[in-house]
């Protein structure tokens, strides 16, 4: 999405293949699947690629939002042995991925040091949209839903990306079924009215084709119905 996208404060990693982690954990009586996942992350972070960067996972805690658990880690990035910055990394286990990852090339920030851009696998756009719809429709029984940013992200993705309708339907079915928090809705529920002001501000900032919350809901509801996204 380039400069039109919402910026993020963390890096999200996902692993659909939890069987191997469970096998390793089962072989070690003291190990749990999340412990094995953390060990694997530490091992990957310690790889020396000859670029003078190193990464240390300083601390972690369990993340309950992933279907089979996850970790939220604070990672310290060092350059030439000195601390450069810290960032947050969320690692989730068990989300289904119904199509091949999308590979993108990073910006060539280290060209001055003779390093080529790296290629990064991303979750398919349809999978990202399915997870956004899941978060958007998730019932918040104990407090008000404040995730207006999910609606912004959905608008940006639908307006800027070429999508496969059938892959999106499959991703929605798989995500709602696997997470098993609430049913895939037949009709898209409207957003809370108190999102209106914040949404209008973000709609201008991200140059959406709509300017109001009602227009955004109408846009997404139309796609939901035409593509029959709520039909299991």
Predicted regions and their residues:
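Structured mid-to-C-terminal alpha-helical surface segments
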Residues: 2-6, 15-232
């Amino acid at each position: 999405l380039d400069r039109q996208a919402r910026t993020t404060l963390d890096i999200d990693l996902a692993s659909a293949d939890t069987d191997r982690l469970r096998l390793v954990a089962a072989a070690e009586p003291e190990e749990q699947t999340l412990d094995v996942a953390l060990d694997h992350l530490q091992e990957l972070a310690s790889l020396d690629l000859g670029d003078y960067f190193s990464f240390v996972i300083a601390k972690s805690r369990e993340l309950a939002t992933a279907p089979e658990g996850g970790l939220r880690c604070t990672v310290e990035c060092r350059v030439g042995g000195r601390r450069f910055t810290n960032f947050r990394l969320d690692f989730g286990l068990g989300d289904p991925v119904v199509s091949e990852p999308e590979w993108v090339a990073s910006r060539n920030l280290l060209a001055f040091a003779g390093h080529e851009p790296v290629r990064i696998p991303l979750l398919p756009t349809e999978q990202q949209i399915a997870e956004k719809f899941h978060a958007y429709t998730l019932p918040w029984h104990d407090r008000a839903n404040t995730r207006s940013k999910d609606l912004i992200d959905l608008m940006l993705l639908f307006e800027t990306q070429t999508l496969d309708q059938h892959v999106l339907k499959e991703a929605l079915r798989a995500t709602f079924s696997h997470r098993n928090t609430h049913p895939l809705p037949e009709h898209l529920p409207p957003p809370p009215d108190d999102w209106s002001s914040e949404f209008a501000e973000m709609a201008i900032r991200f140059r959406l084709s709509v300017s109001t919350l009602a227009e955004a809901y109408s846009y997404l509801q139309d796609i939901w119905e035409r593509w029959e996204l709520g039909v299991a």
